[in-house]
């Protein structure tokens, strides 16, 4: 017998404007810090999900690493994660196509 899923967190529990939920998944506002000593999820910084990326912001390397890191954090394949805005800046919008309740539970662990 499977254990029941925890209740879906309210998207309003996260920083304002950081998480947008719809039927297909979530869109996450991300603040990326390239050329860090290692790639890692930091958590919430102001109104964004902060990640540190070891890759330099050259030829899309940091963007590719950002997508891979977020896919690994949420436990979804990379093909379900896409960069929808911010290809050339630190502020990004990342779309994750997966059941929103599971994604929000993962995000709640950072709060």
From Swiss-Prot:
Top-level taxon: Bacteria
Lineage, broadest ranks: Bacteria, Bacillati, Cyanobacteriota, Cyanophyceae, Gloeobacterales
Signal sequence annotation: none
Name used for this protein in its record: UPF0235 protein glr3835
Record GO cellular component, one term: cytoplasm
InterPro entries according to UniProt: DUF167, YggU-like_sf
NCBIfam families: DUF167 family protein (TIGR00251)
Family membership noted in the UniProt record: Belongs to the UPF0235 family.
Pfam families: DUF167
PANTHER family (alphabetical): UPF0235 PROTEIN C15ORF40 (PTHR13420:SF7)
């Amino acid at each position: 017998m499977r254990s029941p899923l925890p209740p879906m967190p309210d998207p309003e529990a996260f920083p304002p404007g950081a998480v947008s939920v719809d039927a297909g998944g979530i869109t996450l506002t991300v603040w990326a810090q390239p050329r860090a000593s290692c790639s890692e999820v930091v958590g919430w910084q102001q109104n964004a999900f902060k990640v540190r990326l070891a890759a330099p912001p050259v030829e899309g390397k940091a963007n590719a690493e950002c997508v891979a890191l977020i896919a690994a954090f949420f436990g979804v394949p990379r093909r379900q994660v896409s960069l929808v805005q911010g290809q050339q800046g630190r502020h990004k919008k990342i779309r994750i196509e997966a059941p929103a309740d599971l994604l929000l539970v993962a995000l709640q662990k950072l709060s």
